[in-house]
Design a protein with these regions (language model features):
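Class I S-adenosyl-L-methionine
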Residues: 1-2
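Enzymes that bind and transform nitrogen-containing heteroaromatic metabolites
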Residues: 5-214
Length: 214
């Protein structure tokens, strides 16, 4: 059997289950206290994981900041099948280790990314490529913090690669055209729905934080 890292998926949504407006605007759905809480989660993680699509959209730093205790920064991991990560991405200008998993063996692109500080891991494309990536990650990382969009997070949930959801719910309404929390395949029966177990609920600032296991 494959050994996989424990993967916690962090999400923030409105009361009507939306994460971003249709035009992509998503900043500051959750409160400042919730965002600070996320930095605690990051500090407790071995790796912070995202997709290249999320990186291209947000250019996030993927590090823990503003904490008043000592901790080791998590390794930043980008899942980037085609090596679309920009050489100028903000995270390359910040101290820390960045790891890119890809199925693209283009030596020129690999060397470009290595020159700006990335470690690039090539894994041959297979039907279970994402599981192979997670199996490889498990050699070094025990706890992953997943911070990505609804499509990538949904794909990992459907493949059984996510163990826990941390969902911040803000008391706002974004409307039916805004993006959903997670994109999963269409169900034909309620009985097919993925069951989750609520482990903890607490108020964080004006938001509520749910911790659920899958």
């Amino acid at each position: 059997t494959q050994h996989l890292p424990y993967t916690r998926c962090k999400m923030a949504m409105s009361l009507d289950g939306r994460t971003a407006l249709a035009n992509g605007e998503s900043q500051w759905i959750s409160s400042e206290l919730s965002r600070r809480d996320v930095h605690h989660l990051r500090a407790a993680s071995s790796a912070i994981l995202t997709s290249v699509e999320t990186l291209l959209k947000d250019d996030a730093s993927l590090n823990a900041r503003g904490l008043d205790f000592e901790f080791k920064q998590a390794v930043r991991i980008i899942i980037d099948r085609k090596l679309k990560t920009p050489n100028q991405a903000k995270l390359f200008s910040i101290p820390g280790h960045t790891l890119i998993y890809t199925e693209n063996d283009n030596d020129t692109r690999i060397h470009e990314l290595e020159n700006v500080g990335a470690e690039v891991v090539f894994l041959k494309n297979t039907e279970s490529w994402l599981k192979e990536v997670f199996n490889h990650m498990a050699k070094e990382f025990e706890i992953n913090e997943l911070e990505a969009g609804s499509t990538f997070s949904g794909a990992l949930i459907e493949q059984g690669l996510v163990d826990e959801l941390v969902v911040y719910i803000a008391p706002i309404l974004l409307g039916h055209s805004a993006n959903p929390l997670v994109k999963l395949k269409e169900l034909k029966k309620i009985g097919e729905a993925k069951q989750l177990k609520i482990m903890d609920v607490r108020q964080v600032g004006k938001d509520f934080r749910f911790i659920l296991t899958l």
